């Protein structure tokens, strides 16, 4: 994120002395400066000023993130996943957003997981890539070394690689926190075509700087009612060995002899932020607009789009639902969040469903949907889409919640 922010106590000049307040006439101790930067020293970065040495590790041990293995989508089929079936109601209160994620789909570039959570997560740091966590339902407080967020329905939280943070659900037991987690092996950012060469959102972008929420900080241990010298465990996800079921992704638990919320100030252009899908201004036209018109983020070999309530095609002979199309270079994943998705009527897909349309197979409206859409002026639908440019494989959760029927849902017409 190229938009500069500064919070808390920082020195006038970078890489110069920044000290704690003097005590009894004695000079205060130095704060410890940390550069958190992307692409070595060649891209966005922030400087954080810690009370403690950020490299400190008192103890460590291996941990597992469970079954992260994947299975090829073979035979090649479109799939309908039902992630709402994955979490028994009794288990939700003990499940957290981080360790409770269940892998739906993945490849070497991106992994898509689902979680229904009622418990506080451990302190967590993803050392593999950036994350986007979309809040389907519920509310949470997210505490990070940059500051805190209050997140709720429709929020995308974008978390840079190696950001220490934790999730604390704040909704009722009847309204658990439902999240879909997009974990990249790269960075995630707004599409380059939305930005000037200096990183400002351009006029044609469907959202802009005013729509982004930045962390509220600084946030210190005492601000959350905890002690700054408490031993604290931080769970780190990273590449490694492990059994075949790990998918090459393992964890290490670091014990710190202090609380991770020890940043008295920071500044720079790298930090987590929130964007709410309701602030996305849809692009419409006289005839049907293709998915790139609905893009919100991009990563290496994948994009994220959202389809929001909007006025639809207004040519007198327009067909508002999509035409049939073959993703010759990509797999398409659609998460149906809310509303009435016209193109999928009759397929069994509803709120909370996820469809996978793989490359090599043409997909489009269900039988009768095109005719039924004629004359429609508005679509009341909300969906999040991820298109990948390498084939996706099925994770354990994807295999567990596949309805097994979707591939035949187009078979009732054309005879």
Where are these regions (language model features)?
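Jelly-roll (double-stranded beta-helix
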Residues: 1-415
